[in-house]
Amino acid sequence: ITSDLHQYGGWTPLTDVLQMTAIDNNVVQATRVLASQAGRTMDSITRDVLAGGTNVIYAPKLSADGTETAVTSRKALDKSCTLTPKLFFQAAAQLGAMNADPIGDSYIAIIHPYAAYDLKTCKEFMEVHKYADPDTMFRGEIGKLGNIRFIETSEAKIWKDDTCPAGLAVFGTLVLGAHAYGVTELEGGGLEHIVKQLGYGDDPLNQRASVGWKGMRAAERLVEQYMVLSLIHISEPTRHSL
């Protein structure tokens, strides 16, 4: 398996006038904003690679009497295609059948807050404060369903293009086993925080400073069978306008 390695980064200028007149420490404030940008950028790169996986479960259409109709594409989803515990039990069964190792003691699902909202109303869902040992939870973890632990993030994949039903968005929830994917750990190419003080470089009047970051990243799916992409449909217009 090969992958192309790319460099990413961002920066913001800080003038001498701003630093003289502002109440806040602008270097600290800029660092906080850019740190968030750096993390979300790297997460998004990995997310988009994983969201291209081929091991997919589509939420079925549900009729008024509870009859299910299979769905085989994002375009075919409708308002009745909602997130249910059954989808995740199916995903866990697939991973188990493929001998996918858990991450710790469970598989891990990456879920958007709007999708998690639907899941939290299910009686089978166990919230983190009910864990026997809540100290072992991951950052962003919201609960557990069977042997799947859920990590909530606004960076979870959302489709709103021509492959989706008109006027509606499709949310993707990833269910992962160990060794499903890999990312780069390049020596000397990790995230770097860069601060340039006033007068650095071509700045004869000491007017320009800057704060920035850069880093290298590549991500690849390693074993398709060790990850499942569950596609769900969210119908509220406010959710489509994200």
Language model features by range: what are they?
Residues 1-10:
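Assembly/oligomerization interface modules of large self-assembling protein complexes
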Residues 4, 100-103, 203:
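Solvent-exposed alpha-helices and their adjacent loops that cap or buttress functional pockets
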Residues 14-16, 113:
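Residues immediately flanking
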